[in-house]
Amino acid sequence: GVLRDGTTVAVKVLSATSRQGVREFLTELTAISDIKHENLVTLIGCCAEGSHRILVYNYLENNSLAQTLLGSRGSNIRFDWRTRVKIAVGVARGIAFLHEEIRPPIIHRDIKASNILLDKDLTPKISDFGLARLLPPNATHVSTRVAGTLGYLAPEYAIRGQVTKKSDIYSFGVLLLEIVSGRCNTNTRLPYEDQFLLERTWVRYEQERLAEIIDADLGNDLDVDEACRFLKIGLLCTQDAMARRPNMSTVVRMLTGEKHFSVHRITRPAMITDFADLKVSSSQQKENETTRSSNMRSFSTTDETEPFSSSETPTQTSI
């Protein structure tokens, strides 16, 4: 849309006919209205009149990371290595701001490529706070119904419905692998052993062939050592044991090279790829909570089982 002064804006219209639509409107308004950060979208205004529920944001010229970097239609944008570093570090700083620099902290709950918008300078902006949760003082987690996007969901959140900062960190780890590899986290058109990016990255890491994950389209500015370091950070963020995942300010320092880390800390990631995994894992969780291994993984053959969506489709579906 265009305002009277000629300013181009992005208009988000939410459903006013469902309780979920109204709830997401209020959640997003509460979460984003009073905070400003270079790597978060800027709320310009809102409308809650009659049946209308509208949020107005600044317009971002280059769409989302899902459309431009990961989209199948291609893009005129050249995502060289330095641009990808800028995007990865920017998103990490935005999440660190939400988690550590405001009170109460905000857990986004839906960090994914389609919610990372790019301005004219390719500065990343985290968007869509409709699923966000405020973390009460002295609380370590919030219990809630599971919502989000399959492929980015932390297993402990999907299984137990406990939202923590580490849930966002897991999602960021998956996103980081996508940024370095230039591919979506799930692609069922590939041979089975290559369909799931997180598993493929772990296998190549164990084989000491991590460089094979890096996007082959990257040009002469590629720093292979730095790209492999980013992939290792992605694996750190997606470890099955929440306690082993670094906090976001530490992730920022790792990405910028200010903090070094030991590869001996990296343990096998966990992944849930369809709803059947949730049912199996939830049953196991109830039966054997105290003996659940930190190295447990769940894998399946599909990535589009409802009620979750594939990684390219925005969703706010609850189970």
Question: What is each PLM-predicted segment?
Answer:
Residues 1-16, 42:
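Glycine-rich ATP phosphate-binding loop
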Residues 9, 222-233, 239-319:
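Intrinsically disordered, low-complexity cytosolic regulatory tails
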Residues 25, 29-30:
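Regulatory alphaC helix of protein kinase catalytic domains
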Residues 44-52, 61-62:
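Short beta-strand micro-motifs within the conserved protein kinase catalytic domain, predominantly
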Residues 93-106:
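Protein kinase catalytic-loop region centered on the HRD/HxD motif
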Residues 168:
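Conserved catalytic-loop aspartate of Hanks-type protein kinases
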